[in-house]
């Protein structure tokens, strides 16, 4: 009898085990965990970089920027007509619906990058160590600027800050803010000693100093701030490389999800260029970008592990050529253009070299700009910038004779419109 | 005595297990009670249990209706209770005096509705159906016999009011899903709670294979649902409560209803040995009609048709064009044809197969205790070559009467289940899909000199590569055990304590061999693929219920119950995938490219609740029950734990009133019970243990990182609350020959949880939150009757009809359409049922005819266009659609009603049971139909080849000339199936055995439907909330089974 009572009692005691009302998640940290420590924020920097560069948590910004820009400007061709979203971009115009998955994920991932980068900027204020504080802030500035710059390349208006019913600013304001963020970061970097351990944790493959300068040059160029673009581009050390790195677990997204499947999209012959823009048959960049390996890989998308440059030395030279040309400093412009044309693969940090004779065409602004544009198309093939370039160089717009792009700007994603009453009207084309 | 000889060793063993609970038994005078139970015809009735009320003494009648047992009773008045399935319970008083033997003979009458059937579900206090204010379905062991179903879940089909049972796959290890009264949750599971012998068991379907298979984001759950581990031969009875009424007792986990399963136990008497063995033959029930026209559009590239130009000629002109994209499609489709040989790949994929099911049980016992042990083996081969399912089982149960007032019962069930699988649907490397996605013009049996299969269409895979070289396996080791203590220390007080656990370890291994031919899409792993995954599940259940029954007044009986329940669930999931394989090795070590992070995911969750319930019974005809319950789960924040859920129910047995028996209709209208109940429940498993947090994904990148996710949680999320009202009646006519039961119900689910899409400018794209309201309104009816009954012949018939209307009545935050699958084909839209197809449709003229457009001289259909904001179609100056493609609702995968009609005929020892199932008014999204026509092997493609529709018609519908016209892909799934025919012959009193039964059973014999596919019942997403998804799912085989049951 007593023993039965014992069973009863021990059963009741067992109840206590089941009463625990809160279990911590051992698999993943919460937002609070992450932003309450320097170590947590350091790892979010890696997380943001991953979102921007790798398809692990959703289509990466760089992947969809390259895909969308490539399809809208005839750099890429759809391999299977069944890929309706890609076909919409390739066909462009009214075919591009707001619920298009490519522009949807380009928008959402890039907004997440912007939002998380802002959280880093805000979170850095609570860090005691001034070097670490600045380091976190600098990376916050870098990724926020990249997010804003990426969105400004595809949309007319952009939310600068995230939140419920976020408000929109013009792309000029977004690019201006991006430039400010980058320049502030450069200044801050001058007074900061980033601990080596910090750099190795967030990735030494990005040369912070030169990346901040190069991106500032890029966005200044987009803003047509010619002098600032020249100043920044010329300050970049062209021997330094900054890349997004890849491996088997974090595969090069354009290779893995794009070209290697033989069923998504592929590169076009002659970079998709024709007529006056047709590149010279001897242009060695043809070999670099257009010769496919057995896995359909080429250029910066050879295999799972090929690194994608954040900027190329050639871009800095072409920015200086373009800005000078726009300032009518034609001779100076030609010097920079010739540097690109004459550059050998060995001279380029990434092995991109045209190895062509210097520019011999007419020394007019229009001719020079066209040659600069052509070289951007070739040198910076599949860098995600061609839609922006095509607009900036006033190439034939959709609907015009010989149209070289299928859209000017993208419509705002359906999901954004459904959830944000401030979403601006879609562009006509 | 024989009895002792057999029972002693077992008793000894059980004593060892339960040694601590053996207590001294007070010696009271032993009396022998015996007698005979007879039916209306004067013949003895077997299997009637006889119990001395409020004691643990009792026995069961034998084949002649005789019973006899010993009881230790003090002198005084007692009541004997006689109960049995299909009979009205009967009581007889008995006064124990100085004698040592007593006789009690009774006559009992049949009861078609089983209103006096003892019910355990609902309270731990044994009660009768009569007292319950909610509907309950019971399935007894007799009904469980003579069915060819090897998965327990399938047995519920057609036997439970309000249940929709769907076999999602014909894979021998495929799953079945059940919904009681419609979809109860969208984010969480809609499946009922399963309880075996008081222990909550898991019925989920973890994906340990097919990790790379969900190409569509259709949340596939395609393996077996884990109730497959339970052998139906071990089941004694099943009780099912459909609604929130179940939740008041079982806690909010039962908000989708509860299925309580009782395994067999021994009965007092000599040992009984039962052997069941069967053999089954499976075959493909329905063959697809394939294109048979010996021509193909295009210009052949080479003899084997492997050039780019030989791809997709139905929808594209790829000849001589540089890319293969829409720019090329924009050109004129080729009208030239070339001769081809057309094949029917079904001959290569399907094969007839066999299976066997064997079960041996031994049971018996004395008045001190009973035992039941069983062992079983099942093996079944699939009709898709290279697939099978195998299960070993062992089951032990013992019941011990420790003292007059204490009983202990303990049981353990062990199963080892293994399966050989092939990728399920939702991708293009499953056996069905590889066949669907290529035109049927390649000889897939061709091989090179080394015996390797040859390439078929570029990019695609040879279906035989999948069948011959893939190796997918799962293995599950499971054990469910329980220990229950029942105490009746004083008269009227009953205490039940149940402790038990359900634990299993499920391992899956996938090996997809390297493909020996070139040009297969990298997405199909031509470099080979290997994965392993392991899912460990542990759930511990504790239940403690005390109830006290006494007479408050002479005619007013009170039963009070209070209880506490707690569960603790722990899961671990580990997985690794790899590709680029070295030869020979078939495990993860072969992979040279571990392209995903190793997965190691652990969860812990506790669920707890306590309740109080009070029932008043007036003169055993009017019962009023009220209950309240507090429930909480660690999946929710502190503020959302301990929510109060009330319940009330009323049962009025009108026919027990005096006026009824004195009326003249009482001669044919024998029984009328009215019932009504109201209950509230919160879905405690509606979100995962950690879903409420905003969490970052640990990633291996640079020095390690925390990746921000697209989806975020809401820490203040609340459980979905289901409020249900149900009312109904149970009626009996013509002395039990005709029974009618029906229920009307109305479920309102508020705070429905959904991953809700938010504007990305919030910094995330989806938020898991309480987002809407949903209702299920319905009607359930069961008619049972015995139209003919005489000495030798009997005809029983039953009709079950369930109607349910599901509607998402409100979405908060002005949410529009919320897609459930990645393609956004089906989802949630205010005012419509869950899972509606919200899709593009044909542009039509005012008279309803298709508004065609001219494409290269051919008149082709097109999508409707207009203003997306208003959904109003627009026309341009030429009268053609303009604007963005519009969407409309075209059907949903939830049936309007399901019905089952069963006829059972028995003549002497021969019986025939025929079950017809009808599922009506639901639609299937036929992905396979689209694909088959797009690639050319479908019947519409054949019509285009024959010129019966203009060139380009398939391309226009398939989305290659303008957006896809999805309306055409939604097809009516309504079907009537001859589910089962069972012919059984029983032989009694043989020399070597007590009885022997031979059955011939056919399952899934005929389906009457208009569906253009294998079977409208299957679902490629398996047990997921995504329904009606026909994308390469395995067809359900036709099965013939011969079985032999011998009782020794």
Summary of predicted features, one role per range:
Chain A
Residues 1-28:
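Bacterial Sec-dependent N-terminal signal peptides
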Residues 19-68, 395-429:
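Membrane-proximal, proline-rich intrinsically disordered regions
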Residues 20, 179-190, 209-244:
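Aromatic-residue-lined binding/catalytic grooves and analogous aromatic/hydrophobic interfacial grooves
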Residues 42, 48, 82-155, 165-172, ...:
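Conserved, well-structured interaction surfaces
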Residues 81-90, 224-317, 344-359, 365, ...:
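Hydrophobic-face positions in mid-chain alpha helices that act as interaction patches
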Residues 150-159, 193, 222-225, 328:
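Short coil/turn linking the two alpha-helices of tandem helical-hairpin repeats
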């Amino acid at each position: 009898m007593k023993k039965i009572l014992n069973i009863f009692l021990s059963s009741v005691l067992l109840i206590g085990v089941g009463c625990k009302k809160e279990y911590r998640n051992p698999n993943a940290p919460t937002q609070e965990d992450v932003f309450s420590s320097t170590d947590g924020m350091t790892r979010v920097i890696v997380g943001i970089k991953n979102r921007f560069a790798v398809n692990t948590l959703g289509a990466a910004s760089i992947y969809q920027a390259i895909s969308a820009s490539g399809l809208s400007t005839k750099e890429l061709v759809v391999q299977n007509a069944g890929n309706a979203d890609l076909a919409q971009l390739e066909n462009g115009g009214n075919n591009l619906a707001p619920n298009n998955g490519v522009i949807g994920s380009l928008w959402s991932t890039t907004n997440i990058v912007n939002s998380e980068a802002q959280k880093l900027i805000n979170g850095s204020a609570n860090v005691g160590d001034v070097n670490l504080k600045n380091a976190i802030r600098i990376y916050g500035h870098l990724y926020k600027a990249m997010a804003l710059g990426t969105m400004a390349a595809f949309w007319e208006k952009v939310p600068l800050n995230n939140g419920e019913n976020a408000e929109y600013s013009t792309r000029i304001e977004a690019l201006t803010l991006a430039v400010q963020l980058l320049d502030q970061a450069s200044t801050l970097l001058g007074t900061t000693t980033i601990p080596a351990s910090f750099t190795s944790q967030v990735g030494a493959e990005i040369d912070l100093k030169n990346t901040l300068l190069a991106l500032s040059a890029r966005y200044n160029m987009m803003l047509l701030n010619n002098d600032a673009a020249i100043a920044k581009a010329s300050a970049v050390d062209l021997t330094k490389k900054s890349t997004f790195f890849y491996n088997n677990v974090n595969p090069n997204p354009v290779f893995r999800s794009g070209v290697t499947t033989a069923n998504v999209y592929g590169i076009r012959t002659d970079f998709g260029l024709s007529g006056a823009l047709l590149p010279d048959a001897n242009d060695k960049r043809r070999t670099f970008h257009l010769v496919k390996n057995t896995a359909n890989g080429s250029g910066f998308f050879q295999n799972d592990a090929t690194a994608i440059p954040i900027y190329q030395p050639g871009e800095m030279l072409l920015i200086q050529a373009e800005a000078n040309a726009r300032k009518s400093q034609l001779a100076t412009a030609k010097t920079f253009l010739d540097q690109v044309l004459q550059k050998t693969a060995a001279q380029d940090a990434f092995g991109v070299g045209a190895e062509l004779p210097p520019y011999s065409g007419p020394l007019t602004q229009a001719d020079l700009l066209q040659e600069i544009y052509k070289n951007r198309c070739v040198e910076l093939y599949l860098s995600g910038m061609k839609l922006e370039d095509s607009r900036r160089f006033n190439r034939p717009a959709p609907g015009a004779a010989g149209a070289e792009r299928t859209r000017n700007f993208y419509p705002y994603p359906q999901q954004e419109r459904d959830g944000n009453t401030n979403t601006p009207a879609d562009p006509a084309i | 005595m024989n009895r002792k000889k057999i029972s002693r060793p077992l008793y000894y063993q059980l004593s060892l297990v339960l040694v601590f609970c053996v207590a001294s038994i007070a010696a009271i005078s032993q009396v022998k009670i015996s007698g005979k139970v007879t039916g209306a015809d004067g013949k003895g009735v077997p299997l009637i249990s006889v119990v001395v009320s409020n004691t643990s003494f009792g026995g069961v009648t034998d084949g002649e209706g005789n019973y006899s047992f010993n009881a230790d009773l003090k002198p005084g008045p007692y009541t004997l209770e006689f109960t049995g399935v299909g009979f009205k319970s009967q009581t007889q008083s008995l006064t124990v005096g100085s004698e040592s033997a007593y006789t009690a003979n009774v006559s009992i009458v049949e009861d078609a509705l089983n209103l006096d059937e003892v019910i355990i579900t609902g309270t731990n206090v044994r009660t009768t159906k009569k007292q319950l204010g909610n509907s309950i379905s019971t399935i007894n062991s007799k009904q469980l016999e003579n069915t060819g179903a090897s998965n327990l879940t399938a047995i519920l089909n057609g036997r439970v009011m309000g249940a929709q049972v769907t076999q999602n796959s014909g894979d021998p290890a495929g799953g079945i899903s059940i919904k009681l009264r419609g979809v109860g949750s969208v984010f969480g599971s809609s499946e009922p709670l399963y309880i075996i012998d008081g222990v909550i068991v898991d019925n989920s379907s973890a994906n340990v294979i097919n990790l790379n298979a969900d190409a569509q984001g259709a949340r596939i759950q395609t393996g077996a649902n884990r109730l497959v581990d339970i052998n139906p031969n071990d089941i004694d009875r099943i009780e099912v409560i459909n609604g929130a009424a179940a939740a008041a007792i079982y806690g909010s986990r039962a908000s989708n209803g509860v299925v309580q399963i009782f395994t067999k136990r021994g009965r007092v008497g000599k040992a009984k040995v039962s052997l069941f063995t069967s053999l089954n033959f499976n075959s493909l029930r329905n063959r697809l009609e394939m294109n048979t026209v010996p021509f193909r559009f295009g210009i052949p590239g080479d003899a084997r048709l492997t050039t780019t130009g030989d791809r997709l000629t139905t929808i594209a002109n790829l000849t001589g064009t540089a890319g293969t994209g829409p720019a090329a499609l924009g050109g004129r489709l080729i009208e030239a044809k070339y001769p081809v040989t057309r094949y029917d790949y079904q001959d290569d994929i399907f094969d007839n197969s066999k299976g066997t099911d064997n079960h041996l049980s031994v049971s018996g016992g004395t008045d001190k205790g009973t035992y039941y042990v069983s062992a079983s083996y099942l093996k079944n081969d699939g009709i898709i070559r290279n697939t099978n399912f195998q299960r070993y089982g062992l089951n032990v149960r013992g019941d011990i009467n420790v003292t007059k007032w204490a009983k202990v019962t303990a049981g353990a069930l062990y199963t080892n289940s293994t399966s050989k699988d092939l990728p399920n649907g939702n991708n293009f490397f499953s056996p069905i899909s590889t066949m669907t996605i290529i035109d049927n013009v390649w000889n897939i049996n061709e091989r090179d000199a080394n015996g390797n299969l040859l390439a078929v269409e570029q990019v695609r895979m040879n279906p035989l590569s999948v069948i011959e070289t893939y190796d997918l396996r799962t293995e599950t080791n499971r054990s469910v055990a329980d220990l229950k203590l029942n105490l009746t220390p004083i008269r009227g007080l009953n205490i039940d304590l149940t402790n038990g656990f359900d634990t299993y370890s499920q391992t899956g291994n996938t090996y997809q061999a390297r493909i020996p031919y070139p040009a297969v899409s990298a997405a199909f792993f031509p470099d080979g693929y290997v994965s392993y995954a392991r899912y460990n599940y542990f759930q511990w259940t504790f239940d403690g219920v005390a109830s006290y029954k006494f007479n408050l007044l002479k005619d007013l009986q009170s039963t009070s119950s209070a209880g506490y329940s707690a569960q603790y669930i722990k899961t671990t999931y580990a997985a690794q995938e790899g590709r680029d394989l070295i030869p020979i090795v078939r495990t993860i070590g072969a992979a040279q490219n571990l392209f995903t992070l190793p997965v190691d995911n652990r969860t812990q969750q506790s669920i707890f609740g306590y309740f109080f319930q009070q029932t008043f019974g007036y003169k055993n005809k009017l019962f009023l029950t009220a209950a309240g319950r507090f429930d909480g789960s660690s999946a929710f924040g502190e503020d959302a734990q301990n929510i109060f859920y009330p319940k009330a129910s009323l049962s009025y047995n009108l026919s027990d009133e005096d006026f009824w028996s004195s009326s003249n209709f009482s001669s044919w209208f024998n029984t009328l019970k009215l019932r009504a109940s109201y209950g509230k429940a919160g879905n405690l498993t509606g979100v995962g243990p950690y879903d409420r947090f905003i969490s970052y994904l640990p990633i291996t990148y640079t020095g390690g990182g925390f990746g921000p996710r697209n989806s975020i949680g809401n820490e203040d999320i609340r459980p979905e609350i289901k409020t249900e009202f149900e009312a109904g009646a149970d009626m009996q006519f013509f002395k039990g020959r005709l029974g009618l039961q029906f229920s009307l119900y109305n479920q309102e689910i508020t705070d429905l949880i959904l991953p809700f899409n938010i504007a990305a400018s919030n910094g995330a794209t989806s938020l898991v939150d309480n987002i809407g309201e949903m209702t299920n309104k319905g009607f359930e009816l069961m008619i049972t009757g015995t139209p003919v009954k005489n000495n030798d012949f009997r005809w029983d018939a039953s009709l079950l009809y369930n109607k349910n209307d599901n509607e998402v009545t409100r979405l908060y935050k002005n949410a529009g359409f919320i897609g459930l699958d990645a393609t956004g084909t089906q989802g949630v839209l205010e005012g419509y049922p869950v899972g509606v197809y919200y899709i593009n449709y044909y542009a039509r003229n005012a008279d309803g005819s298709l508004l065609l457009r001219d494409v290269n001289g051919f008149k082709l259909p097109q999508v409707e266009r207009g203003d997306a904001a208003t959904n109003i179609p627009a026309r341009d100056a030429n009268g053609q659609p303009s604007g963005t493609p519009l969407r409309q609702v075209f059907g949903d995968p939830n049936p309007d009603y399901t019905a089952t009609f069963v006829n059972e005929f028995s003549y002497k020892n021969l019986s025939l049971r025929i079950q017809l199932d009808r599922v009506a008014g639901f639609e299937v999204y036929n992905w396979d139909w689209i694909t088959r026509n797009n690639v050319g092997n479908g019947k519409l493609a054949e019509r285009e080849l024959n010129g019966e529709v203009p060139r380009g018609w398939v391309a226009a519908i398939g989305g290659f000339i303008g957006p896809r016209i999805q309306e055409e892909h939604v097809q009516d799934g309504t079907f009537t199936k001859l589910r089962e025919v069972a012919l059984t012959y029983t032989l009694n009193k043989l020399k070597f055995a007590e009885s022997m039964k031979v059955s011939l059973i056919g399952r899934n014999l005929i389906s009457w439907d208009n569906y253009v596919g294998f079977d409208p019942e299957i679902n490629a997403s398996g047990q997921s909330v995504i329904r009606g998804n026909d994308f390469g799912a395995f067809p359900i085989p036709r099965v013939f089974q011969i079985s032999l049951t011998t009782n020794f």
